[in-house]
A protein has these predicted regions:
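Flexible, processing/modification-adjacent segments and terminal tails
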Residues: 25-43, 49, 58-59, 87, ...
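Short, exposed beta-strand/loop patches in secreted or surface proteins that constitute
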Residues: 63-67, 87-88, 142, 200-202
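Short hydrophobic/aromatic-rich beta-strand segments that constitute the beta-sheet cores
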Residues: 46, 73-77, 95-99, 105-107, ...
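Bacterial N-terminal signal peptides
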Residues: 11-20
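N-terminal, post-signal-peptide region of Sec/Tat-exported proteins
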Residues: 47-82
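Short, mixed charged/polar active-site loops
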Residues: 57-62, 83-87, 105, 169, ...
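Gly/Pro-enriched, hydrophobic low-complexity segments
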Residues: 128, 148-246
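Bacterial N-terminal signal peptides that target proteins for export
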Residues: 1-11
C-alpha cells in the first residue's frame, strides 16, 4: 500500500529540516563559545596544583599560568624543586618549552602535542589550548541530560576538515544554569572512548563561573587519573603581549 503525503506538507518538511539542523549547529556553537568565555575570559592568571595518580604512586606538580584570548599562553613550573623553572609558551599555533637545566628553548612539533604533559594524563595540547573547541570543531546540540544533578546541554563536537585535531569526536555536557562544561568525553577516530574529564567545585570569580577542580580519567588505565586544583584565579587582567615571548619565558618568576 502506497502512502501519499500532501504536497504542501512535503514542501514544509523539506524547508524546515535543514533549518532545524542549522539551528542545532548554531545553538551548539553559541553554547560552547559562552562556556569557553565564561571559564577563560579575555585574559587570566591561575595558580595550579596537579596531582598525578597511579596505582602504585602519586606525585604533584605546581605551576602558574597566564593566558590572553585564545592565542597566547604561558606556563611556569614552581614545583617540585627538580622541575622548577621550566616554562611553556604558546603563541597562536606555535608552542615552545624552556629548560633552565640545559638553557635551551625547544619548539614543540605538532607530533608531540598529544604527549603526556609532565607525565600526566593531560597532553601539551590540553594544557596550552593549542587547538580551539570553538574554531577547530563543528558543533551539534544533541539535546539535554542530567549530570551530577545538573541539567546540561549535550553537544557533539567533530573536527573540521583540515583542522590539526587528533580526536575523532568530543562530547560535552554544559550546565544550563552556569554555562560550565561539567563533563567532556574524548573519542578517537574509531569512536572509542579515550578519556573523560569531570569539572567540579564551581566558584563565582569576577562575575564568572569557574570549576576549581578538574579530574581527567583515562578509559584504559584502571586506577589512574590526574586531578587539577586551581587557586588564586584572576580574570580580565591587563596582560601585554610582551610576556608571551621566548625572551620572557626564560626569566619568568
Amino acid at each position: 500500500m502506497k502512502i501519499y503525503f500532501p504536497k504542501k506538507l512535503l514542501v514544509l518538511f523539506l524547508i524546515v529540516c535543514p533549518v532545524v539542523f542549522v539551528r542545532a549547529q548554531a545553538d551548539g556553537k553559541s553554547i560552547i563559545e559562552k562556556a569557553e568565555l565564561n571559564t577563560r575570559g579575555k585574559s587570566s592568571y591561575m595558580e595550579t596544583n596537579m596531582e598525578i595518580i597511579r596505582p602504585k604512586w602519586t606525585r604533584s606538580v605546581q605551576f602558574k599560568s597566564w593566558s590572553s584570548e585564545s592565542n597566547y599562553g604561558l606556563v611556569f613550573i614552581t614545583g617540585p624543586a627538580k622541575e622548577k623553572g621550566q616554562s611553556f609558551l604558546k603563541r597562536n599555533m606555535e608552542v615552545w618549552s624552556w629548560s633552565p637545566a640545559i638553557r635551551r628553548t625547544i619548539k614543540i612539533p605538532p607530533s608531540m602535542m598529544l604527549q603526556g604533559w609532565m607525565g600526566s594524563d593531560y597532553t601539551n595540547d590540553d594544557l596550552l589550548k593549542a587547538s580551539s573547541v570553538v574554531d577547530d570543531y563543528t558543533h551539534k546540540l544533541l539535546g539535554e541530560e542530567t549530570v551530577d544533578g545538573k541539567r546540561c546541554y549535550k553537544i557533539e563536537l567533530k573536527p573540521k576538515d583540515g583542522a590539526a585535531i587528533v580526536w575523532g569526536m568530543l562530547l560535552k555536557w554544559v550546565s544550563k544554569d552556569q554555562l560550565v562544561a561539567v563533563k567532556t568525553e574524548y573519542y578517537d577516530e574509531l569512536g572509542e572512548l579515550v578519556k573523560t574529564e569531570i569539572a567540579s567545585n564551581i566558584k563565582t570569580i569576577s562575575g564568572r563561573n569557574m570549576p576549581s577542580k578538574l579530574e581527567l580519567i583515562p578509559a584504559d588505565k584502571s586506577g589512574s587519573k590526574t586531578v587539577i586544583t586551581y587557586s588564586n584565579m584572576k580574570f580580565d587582567i591587563p596582560l601585554g603581549t610582551e610576556i608571551f615571548t621566548q625572551q620572557y619565558m626564560q626569566r619568568v618568576k
